[in-house]
UniProtKB/Swiss-Prot annotation:
<feature type="compositionally biased region" description="Polar residues">
    <location>
        <begin position="1"/>
        <end position="15"/>
    </location>
</feature>
<keyword id="KW-0378">Hydrolase</keyword>
<dbReference type="InterPro" id="IPR019165">
    <property type="entry name" value="Peptidase_M76_ATP23"/>
</dbReference>
<comment type="similarity">
    <text>Belongs to the peptidase M76 family.</text>
</comment>
<keyword id="KW-0472">Membrane</keyword>
<dbReference type="GO" id="GO:0034982">
    <property type="term" value="P:mitochondrial protein processing"/>
</dbReference>
<dbReference type="Pfam" id="PF09768">
    <property type="entry name" value="Peptidase_M76"/>
</dbReference>
<keyword id="KW-0482">Metalloprotease</keyword>
<keyword id="KW-0999">Mitochondrion inner membrane</keyword>
<feature type="region of interest" description="Disordered">
    <location>
        <begin position="1"/>
        <end position="20"/>
    </location>
</feature>
<keyword id="KW-0479">Metal-binding</keyword>
<protein>
    <recommendedName>
        <fullName>Mitochondrial inner membrane protease ATP23</fullName>
        <ecNumber>3.4.24.-</ecNumber>
    </recommendedName>
</protein>
<dbReference type="GO" id="GO:0004222">
    <property type="term" value="F:metalloendopeptidase activity"/>
</dbReference>
<feature type="binding site">
    <location>
        <position position="136"/>
    </location>
    <ligand>
        <name>a divalent metal cation</name>
    </ligand>
</feature>
<feature type="binding site">
    <location>
        <position position="140"/>
    </location>
    <ligand>
        <name>a divalent metal cation</name>
    </ligand>
</feature>
<keyword id="KW-0496">Mitochondrion</keyword>
<comment type="function">
    <text>Has a dual role in the assembly of mitochondrial ATPase. Acts as a protease that removes N-terminal residues of mitochondrial ATPase CF(0) subunit 6 at the intermembrane space side. Also involved in the correct assembly of the membrane-embedded ATPase CF(0) particle, probably mediating association of subunit 6 with the subunit 9 ring.</text>
</comment>
Amino acid sequence: MAEAASSGSNSTSPPKDNGYIPGDDAWTICRNLWRGLTGKMTQEGMEQFRVARDVRNEKEDCKRCEDQRDYLLQYSPLIRFLQDNIQQLGGNISKHNIFCRRCKNRQAGGFDPDYGIQICANEMRNQGHLEDTLAHEMIHAYDHMRFKVDWDDNLRHAACAEIRASNLSGECRWMREFFSRGQWKFAQHHQECVRRRAILSVQARPACKDEQHATQVVNEVWDSCFRDTRPFDEIYR
């Protein structure tokens, strides 16, 4: 009896099947797609499938991102305007410090004063999405040069920067909200989008306690930061 109990306590249960089948061949990919469509794959399995896809397509995703980045730097009125205004403040944003990379976290991009701008190539849906993302991060770069933003310790600074970037980049215009995020409201949709995205960004910062704290900080700076459209005369798009 003691032996049986000991043997049972040392045994391990088999890993739970999440529905994902490892493999990069076409047949396995099709099987995984079918499992996802028919509900035979858990959320964990879907995430594994997504990560495997991103790794598999990394080279192509980054090349497409770089080509679209270079096109936007040359031909996009919005991106060129922001680039010129950053240069007037003594900064320089170009293809040499805008990096296309595969990101592990579900985010579109990021700005670091010492590094530059990172675009998450595996999250870009199309060139329009990349333009919105690049504009968002370039507005952060502009704010860093003009207002000396304390990104690490001052949540009010971070909240204001996120409000301005979401407000001015074009990512909250109605068409983008409707087709990409399933937001159907007409009235006040722009303000609600800006507020929602600012709260999510502030909430992700280490100094923020929770969603309530993030909401409070965003509300404290909302009026002045939402009205501030520099370097534009008004909301561009």
